[in-house]
C-alpha cells in the first residue's frame, strides 16, 4: 500500500521534475522514508527516472535544500510540519501529496513501561512545534503528564 501511494506521489513530482531531466533527487529520513524510496527505485528506473536519494537525519535541511533548488523534492514530513516550516522560514513549499504519519516511540534503558516513570522524571520530546505538541498530547493521554 505504501509503495502504491508513494508511486502515485512521485508520479506527480516526476511529471514536473523529470521532464527537465531524467535525474530526480529526493531527500528522505533514513527509516522508513529512504527505505520506501529504495523499494520504488527499480520501478522508476524502468520509467527512465534515475532516483537519487539523499538521506538526512535533520528535519530542516531537506526543506531548505528544496527551497534553494538543490533537491527536487523531499519525503519525510506531514502537512502541519510543512506549514510551520514555511511560516518560520518564509518559504512557500507545497506538498505534492500527503504522507503517512509515523508513530511516536518512547525509549528508555531504565523503564519498560510509561507507568514505571517516577514523578519528576525527565522526558525528551521532539523540538519542533507540531511533533512536540503531538508528543505532549500522547503523554497526557497516557497519564504521564497533565495538560
Predicted regions and their residues:
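Gram-negative bacterial Sec-dependent N-terminal signal peptides
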Residues: 1-20
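Immediate post-signal peptide segment of exported/extracytoplasmic ligand-binding proteins
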Residues: 18-25, 44-45, 114-120
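Short, well-ordered beta-strand elements
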Residues: 21-31, 51-55, 122-123
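A local structural motif
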Residues: 43-55, 119-120, 144-147
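Short helix-initiation/N-cap motifs at beta->coil->alpha
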Residues: 53-64
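Alpha-to-beta junction loops
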Residues: 67-77, 121, 144
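Ligand-binding "clamshell"
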Residues: 84-96, 111
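A conserved helix-loop-strand patch within extracytoplasmic ligand-binding domains
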Residues: 96-146
Amino acid at each position: 500500500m505504501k509503495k502504491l501511494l508513494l508511486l502515485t506521489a512521485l508520479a506527480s513530482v516526476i511529471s514536473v521534475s523529470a521532464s527537465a531531466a531524467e535525474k530526480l533527487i529526493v531527500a528522505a529520513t533514513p527509516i522508513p522514508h529512504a527505505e520506501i524510496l529504495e523499494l520504488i527505485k527499480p520501478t522508476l528506473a524502468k520509467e527512465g527516472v534515475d532516483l537519487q536519494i539523499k538521506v538526512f537525519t535533520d528535519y530542516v535541511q531537506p526543506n531548505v535544500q528544496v527551497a534553494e533548488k538543490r533537491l527536487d523534492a523531499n519525503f519525510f514530513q506531514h502537512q502541519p510540519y510543512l506549514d510551520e516550516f514555511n511560516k518560520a522560514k518564509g518559504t512557500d513549499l507545497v506538498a505534492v501529496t500527503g504522507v503517512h504519519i509515523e508513530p511516536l516511540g518512547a525509549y528508555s534503558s531504565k523503564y519498560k513501561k510509561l507507568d514505571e516513570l517516577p514523578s519528576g522524571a525527565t522526558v525528551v520530546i521532539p523540538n519542533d512545534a507540531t511533533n512536540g505538541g503531538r508528543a505532549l498530547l500522547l503523554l497526557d493521554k497516557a497519564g504521564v503528564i497533565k495538560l
